Regions:
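Conserved alpha/beta enzyme-core scaffolds, especially Rossmann-like or related mixed alpha/beta domains
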Residues: 1, 27-37, 66, 140, ...
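A broad, structural surface signal
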Residues: 50-57, 71-74, 117-124, 132-143, ...
Length: 558
């Protein structure tokens, strides 16, 4: 157990308190006490080091030994073979608000993560030597993921600096990515999910940009010329708030929420109460304003008025968009609900002028799915979480972290929520709630104030999240199509996900990093022999067969 805060001056009383707080003495092992002025405070001092050298000579003190963190862990595991282990999520019952605070920062971080992947890949395929430039961009990017920056718990000048850095990084990556005559699929599986392709002459609008909705149908790691086909607009009907499409018959309320979502393909209803319902709560967690959300945040709900009832604002042969304008006393919220001719997804775009104080905005989805678990996407896999609230531990997990998607399924069918930069989500019985915006005042009184534009997609599906390929759909939702004239000569490595293709840090070798993201095992027979590497890109063997296990990360050299 480390000290309880980020500053420890190595006083004898702190050492004693640390030892007394260590409750597993009967299991053996040691406890670590890290000392120094933390949180940007410059670390340990000479006085602290001198105290450390004297502790071992005092009989009234616990036995102390000075060593580094790696040495401590190695020695502790070697000397104590029977140490108890924890399997599963270590859930911190605080700082839940950091999943949501500073929405624009988190959204831009997500976009840049995918742009780094694209820039590295295209540099390798073009034979360009951009590694040193990309490395410097990575360093600046990772500094802004540091404690208090990406979580949003920082003062306003930090936010301004971070967004300026992100703009600089994005411009440099865009220059590396460049352009071409054809659209290149950077994903190592067929790109078959509906996508928005910018086009100044397009008939649709998204994020304020004109373009077209189309199904690319581009094979893995291949290029293709895309042209929007023209279709008649008679693929849907809309009357008195009810829309019928090839996939759904949905009844919507004036505020954009659903009173019914009937699945024409699966012959079932999906809703059971408020579905796609925007709710704004009073959010006043006290001392740790930007950090925390309290369990009682639902006690007071803020009234939302409908300024413009839901109505069709745009439609073509692929997409129909319904628009409603909502407001509070201080903020304006435009919600655009999109249905598609060729996709089961229902996209919701939110254009928000946000000027609140101590507020939490959520989109809530009460479904009729019977389940006690939900799946949440992570950076290279997913984690399973309980949705019922029988115990105090379950009740404490009212807000959890996820990445690109979350899912609730029963046998045969379920619903996923796919996002482009939202990380906080709650589960309560059969209800999912996606956290959208916060309005904290400490340590930044202007936190999240201003303009926001973000989307999420509701994705009902047959089967479960794995069999419905939700992860592939979410990857396509987050990885924009790019124009590039390149050719791929390596295997596609399906069904593993191509996490990265990059130049080696220490040689001219090309490094391929793969991850298994569906919890399965198997093997891939390659048409060549490749080097098997560890995560540090050190060679550990050669192979022509990749044997993989659930959620394994594999690094190869070619």
């Amino acid at each position: 157990v480390p000290p309880t805060h980020f500053i420890t001056w190595n006083a004898p009383s702190q050492i004693q308190e640390n030892w007394e707080a260590y409750i597993d003495k009967d299991q053996g092992g040691q406890t670590m006490n890290m000392f120094g002025y933390g949180d940007g405070g410059s670390g340990c001092t000479e006085e602290m080091i001198e105290l450390m050298h004297r502790f071992d000579k005092l009989s009234v003190m616990p036995k102390c030994e000075h060593m580094g963190g790696a040495e401590f862990l190695e020695k502790n595991l070697k000397d104590n073979k029977n140490l108890q282990t924890w399997d599963g999520e270590l859930y911190l019952e605080m700082h839940r608000g950091t999943f949501t605070t500073k929405s624009n920062l988190k959204q831009k971080n997500r976009q840049l993560e995918f742009k780094f992947r694209t820039a590295e890949m295209l540099s390798v395929l073009r034979g360009e030597d951009n590694q040193s430039q990309i490395t410097e961009l990575y360093k600046k990017f990772l500094v802004n993921q540091f404690h208090d920056i990406l979580p949003g718990s920082h003062i306003h000048p930090v936010y301004e600096d971070a967004m300026a850095d992100y703009t600089e990084i994005e411009n440099a990556l865009d220059e590396i990515i460049g352009t071409g005559s054809k659209f290149f699929n950077t994903l190592n599986f067929e790109r078959n999910a509906l996508a928005f392709v910018p086009n100044k002459n397009g008939s649709a609008t998204r994020h304020g940009v004109k373009g077209n909705w189309l199904v690319p149908s581009i094979p893995a790691l291949s290029s293709k010329t895309l042209r929007a086909a023209k279709h008649s607009n008679d693929w849907f009907t809309y009357e008195n708030g009810t829309i019928t499409t090839p996939f759904y018959t949905a009844s919507l309320n004036s505020d954009g929420s659903f009173s019914s979502l009937y699945d024409n393909e699966l012959c079932r209803e999906w809703t059971d109460g408020d579905f796609n319902k925007l709710k704004i709560y009073t959010d006043n967690p006290g001392n740790y304003d930007a950090w925390d959300i309290l369990p009682n945040y639902k006690d007071k709900q803020i009234e939302i008025k409908v300024d413009e009832p839901l109505a069709i604002c745009e439609h073509d042969g692929e997409c129909v968009t319904l628009k409603t304008v909502l407001s509070t006393e201080k903020s304006k919220w435009t919600m655009l609900v999109r249905f598609f001719r060729q996709s089961r997804g229902i996209e919701v775009e939110n254009q928000v002028s946000w000027h609140e104080k101590h507020r939490l905005a959520k989109a809530e989805f009460a479904s009729n799915i019977l389940t006690r678990k939900a799946l949440c996407d992570t950076s290279a896999g997913f984690i399973e979480r309980e949705t019922n609230k029988n115990t105090t531990w379950q009740q404490a997990r009212f807000e959890t972290c996820h990445h690109k998607w979350c899912d609730m399924s029963e046998t045969g069918a379920g619903i996923s929520l796919i996002n482009e930069g939202k990380y906080g989500v709650g589960f309560d019985e059969n209800t999912m709630s996606l956290s959208l915006l916060r309005a904290t005042i400490r340590p930044d009184v202007t936190s999240d104030m201003g303009e926001h534009d973000f989307c999420y997609m509701i994705m009902p599906h047959s089967g479960d999240a794995v069999s419905a390929d939700i992860n592939k759909i979410a990857l396509q939702y987050n990885a924009p199509l790019v124009k590039a004239d390149v050719e791929w000569s390596l295997p596609t490595f399906e069904p593993l996900y191509l996490q990265a293709v990059k130049k080696s840090e220490d040689s001219d070798m090309t490094v391929v990093r793969l991850s298994e993201q569906n919890g399965t095992r198997g093997e891939i027979k390659l048409d060549r022999t490749v080097k098997l590497l560890n995560m540090l890109e050190e060679e550990i063997g050669e192979t022509d067969t990749i044997k993989y296990s659930p959620f394994e990360i594999i690094t190869l050299g070619v």
